Amino acid sequence: GRIPTRDNLHDLFNGLAWFAFPQAKARLNAMQARALKKASADEGRGPLRDAVTIFDENGLVLACSSDELAQALRRFDWRTLFVERRTATLMQTEPWAIGHGLLEKLVRPYKAITAHALIVPVDDSYFRASPQQRRTTIDRLVADWLDNWPFFTARDLCPLPVLGLPGWWPDN
């Protein structure tokens, strides 16, 4: 298919997100279209459309094989995630930026960049797969999650200060 874009980084990154995560992006697009069709002008966006928009713009998928690290993220326990369990975070998680607005922010990084992260449980074998296989797996898992969670709200996403992620920023 074709992806309409304007001449700016925001649309370029949206196009790249479509190429990298076609199943997940298609689900997000379909969910937004359904929410738009249902919504009346008086209601505003509503919780589903809010969540879809936030994730589409600022989403990050965190593949995670550790319940302890997933819980640390849900508790906003940055010390555990980024300092005390730094090696485990490097070995048992893999972040995938899916939000095109997030990618645009990362062109000129600043300390306070915070993604809206969807934690996707994976087993240890995930980390032995090739990067292409892992990306394809993440695309499928996110698409499946979106298909099977009709009550998606922004509360399903965890704030994640991305420059705190081990390996994402030279000053870290």
Indicate where each model-derived feature is located.
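A contiguous, surface-oriented mixed alpha/beta subdomain in the mid-to-C-terminal portion of proteins
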Residues: A33-N172
